Design a protein with these regions (language model features):
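Hydrophobic transmembrane architecture of multi-pass small-molecule transporters
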Residues: 9-18, 23-30, 34, 79, ...
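Transmembrane core module of solute transporters
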Residues: 39-103, 108-111, 116, 122, ...
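Membrane-embedded alpha-helical segments of multi-pass transporters/permeases
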Residues: 123-127, 211-216, 275-279, 378-381, ...
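Cytoplasmic helix-loop-helix junction between adjacent transmembrane helices
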Residues: 145-174
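Glycine/proline-centered helix-kink
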Residues: 150, 171, 176, 180-188, ...
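Hydrophobic alpha-helical segments of secondary membrane carriers
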Residues: 171-175, 305, 429-433
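C-terminal membrane-cytosol helix-exit motif in multi-pass small-molecule transporters
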Residues: 205-223, 239-251, 269-283, 520-527
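Central mid-sequence intracellular linker of multi-pass
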Residues: 206-245, 262, 289-295, 454-480, ...
Length: 540
C-alpha cells in the first residue's frame, strides 16, 4: 500500500521522502519496532494473510449454503438469509470502532483476541441447534471480526521495510479480493460433499494457527493500550444507524423496498440516527469514530473511489455465478471454475504493482484498474445464452489484471499524508465504507437484475402468440412431442426466462462498465504527492 504520498501503517519512513517522516511528537511509533526479517517475516505474513482470508471468506461462504441450512433448521430460505444479514450488520457496526478499540487494548492484543473469538464463534455456529441460536452466534462472529481486516493491514505493513511496503500491501489486497470469489465455490463444495456446519468448522484450525503465530511474533511489538473514554452516545447512535441501514440494504429486495412499511421504518431510523451521529461525533472531544478524517481531500476522494469501485466489483462478483447457475445450467462447481481463475493474473502482477506504487502516480495505476474493469464488463455485456465456457472464462482471467492495480494504489491515496497514530482509525473507517458499498452494490444490482428481467420478459412475451410464425412452429413441435398445451407454454416460458435474465444481466454489466469509466473523474480529483511516503510509519 505504498504510494506517492503514502506510508504504510507502522512501517519505517520511506527512503523517497525522509523529510516527511513524522517525529515521535507527531504520533509516530516509538523507535524499536524494526521491520521483521527471515522466517519471522514469512510466518508473520502467512498468519496475517490467513486471518484476513478467513474473515473475508466468511462474508460469502454461507451464501450458497442457505438452502441446506434452512432445510436442516426447518425454516424458509427467506428466514435463512438472516444467517448472512446478521453477520453483515454486526461486522458493519464493529469495523469503524477499530480506532477506539486499538487505543483501548493495543493492536496485537486486539487482533489476537479477535481471531480467537472468531474461532470460538465459528465453532458455536457449527454447533447451533436452531436458527435463533445460529443467528446469535453469527452476530457474535461479525462483531469480533470487525477489527481483523484493518489491523491485519496495519500489522502487515509494519512488518516490512518501507521499500517493500507496496509488496506487502499487494499480498494483503489479494486475500481481500480473491476470498469473496472463493467463498461460494468452497461453501458449495463443503455443503454438497460434507455438511454445512463445516463451512464454519474450517475456520478453527486456520484461526488457531493465525492467532498463535501472530501472538508469538508480534506481542513484543505492541505499543500497548491507553486509557481512553468510551463515547457511549456515539456508540448507541452508530449501532442504530449502521444496524438499520444494513438490515434495510440486505432485506430491501426481499421486502420490495419502499413498498414495505418495515423498510420505510428502517430508512427513517437510519437517516435520523445518522444525522444525530454526525452532529455528535463532529463536536465530541473523544469521538468513537474519527469523522474528521473526511476533511482530508485524499482520504475522502480515495475512500469514495475505492468504495464505489468495490461496490461495482462485488455486485458483479455475486451476480455472475447466480446467472450461470440459475439460467445457464452451471453447477456450483462449474460456476466456481468459471470465476476462480480471476486470481491468476492478479497474483502474477500484484508484486510488480506493489514494488512500483511508490514510484508511479497511484492515480495512473488505479486508472489501469478502472479501465480494465470497465473493459471486462463491456466484454460481458455481449454475453448471450449461447456463450460457452471459454467465452465466459476469458474476461474472468483478464479481470485479474485489473484486480492487481485496484486496492494498492487506491489505498495509497486514502492514507496519503496521515500520521501513524491515525492509521487504525483511518483503516477502520475506510474499510467500513468499502464493506457497506459492497453490500449496497450487491443489493442494488440483484434488484436491478430482477426488474430488468421482468421488463425483458414482458417484451419477449408479446411476440409469443399464434400470429408469430416462429412461436407457432415451436409450440407445434412441442405438441408433436407429446406436450400438453400447458406444458408447451411452460417450456416456452422457461426459454423466455433464460433470455430475459440473460439480457438483464448484460444490462447490468454494461451499466457497471460505464460507471467504472465515470469513476475516473473522481479518482483524478485526488492530489497525492509523488515521492511522499509509502509505508506506515510516515505520513500516511
Amino acid at each position: 500500500m505504498s504510494s506517492p504520498s503514502i506510508t504504510a501503517p507502522g512501517a519505517a519512513q520511506p527512503p523517497s521522502a525522509p523529510a516527511q517522516a513524522p517525529s515521535a511528537a507527531s504520533g509516530a511509533p516509538k523507535p524499536g519496532f524494526a521491520p521483521l526479517t527471515g522466517s519471522q517475516l514469512v510466518l508473520g505474513t502467512v498468519a496475517l494473510s490467513l486471518a484476513t482470508f478467513m474473515n473475508v471468506l466468511d462474508t460469502s461462504i454461507a451464501n450458497v449454503s442457505i438452502p441446506a441450512i434452512s432445510g436442516d433448521m426447518g425454516v424458509s430460505p427467506a428466514q435463512g438469509t438472516w444467517v448472512i444479514t446478521s453477520f453483515a450488520v454486526a461486522n458493519a457496526i464493529s469495523v469503524p470502532l477499530t480506532g477506539w478499540l486499538t487505543q483501548r487494548f493495543g493492536q496485537v492484543r486486539l487482533f489476537t483476541a479477535s481471531v480467537l473469538l472468531f474461532v470460538i464463534a465459528s465453532w458455536l455456529c457449527g454447533l447451533a441447534p436452531n436458527m435463533p441460536m445460529l443467528i446469535f452466534f453469527r452476530v457474535l462472529q461479525g462483531l469480533v471480526a470487525g477489527p481483523m481486516i484493518p489491523l491485519s493491514q496495519t500489522l502487515l505493513l509494519a512488518s516490512y521495510p518501507a521499500a517493500k511496503a507496496g509488496t506487502a500491501m499487494a499480498m494483503w489486497a489479494m486475500t481481500v479480493l480473491v476470498a469473496p470469489v472463493a467463498g461460494p465455490l468452497l461453501g458449495g463444495w463443503i455443503t454438497d460433499n460434507i455438511a454445512w456446519p463445516w463451512i464454519f468448522y474450517i475456520n478453527i484450525p486456520v484461526g488457531l494457527v493465525a492467532a498463535g503465530l501472530t501472538w508469538s511474533i508480534y506481542r513484543s511489538r505492541d505499543p500497548g493500550p491507553k486509557r481512553v473514554p468510551l463515547d457511549r452516545v456515539g456508540l448507541v447512535l452508530l449501532v442504530l444507524f449502521v444496524g438499520a441501514m444494513q438490515i434495510m440494504i440486505d432485506k430491501g429486495k426481499e421486502l420490495d423496498w419502499f413498498n414495505s412499511g418495515q423498510i420505510v421504518t428502517l430508512a427513517v431510523v437510519a437517516v435520523v440516527s445518522f444525522l444525530f451521529f454526525l452532529a455528535w461525533e463532529l463536536t465530541d472531544k473523544q469521538p468513537i469514530v474519527d469523522l474528521r478524517l473526511f476533511a482530508r481531500r485524499n482520504f475522502v476522494l480515495g475512500t469514495l473511489s475505492l468504495s464505489i469501485a468495490y461496490g461495482l466489483f462485488f455486485g458483479n462478483v455475486v451476480l455472475l455465478p447466480l446467472w450461470l447457475q440459475q439460467y445457464m445450467g452451471y453447477t456450483a462447481t462449474w460456476a466456481g471454475l468459471a470465476t476462480a481463475p480471476v486470481g491468476i493474473l492478479a497474483i502474477v502482477l500484484s508484486p510488480w504493482v506493489g514494488k512500483n506504487v511508490g514510484k508511479i502516480d497511484p492515480r495512473k495505476l488505479a486508472t489501469v484498474a478502472f479501465v480494465g474493469f470497465g473493459g471486462v464488463l463491456w466484454m460481458r455485456s455481449h454475453f448471450n445464452t449461447q456463450a460457452d465456457f471459454m467465452t465466459i472464462l476469458i474476461p474472468t482471467v483478464l479481470q485479474g489484471a485489473a484486480m492487481a492495480f485496484f486496492f494498492i494504489p487506491l489505498q495509497a491515496i486514502v492514507f496519503s499524508g496521515l500520521t501513524p497514530d491515525r492509521m487504525p482509525a483511518a483503516s477502520g473507517l475506510s474499510n467500513f465504507v468499502r464493506i457497506t458499498a459492497g453490500a449496497v452494490g450487491t443489493s442494488l444490482f440483484t434488484t436491478l437484475w430482477e426488474s430488468r428481467a421482468a421488463l425483458h420478459h414482458a417484451q419477449l412475451s408479446e411476440s409469443v402468440n399464434r400470429g408469430n410464425a416462429t412461436a407457432t412452429q415451436a409450440l407445434n413441435q412441442l405438441a408433436a412431442s407429446g406436450y400438453t398445451p400447458e406444458q408447451a407454454l411452460a417450456s416456452v416460458n422457461r426459454l423466455l426466462d433464460q433470455q430475459a435474465y440473460t439480457l438483464a444481466v448484460t444490462d447490468v454489466f454494461y451499466l457497471s462498465a460505464v460507471l467504472f469509466f465515470a469513476l475516473l473523474v473522481l479518482l483524478w480529483a485526488a492530489r497525492p504527492k509523488l515521492g511522499a511516503a509509502a509505508g506506515g510509519g510516515g505520513a500516511h
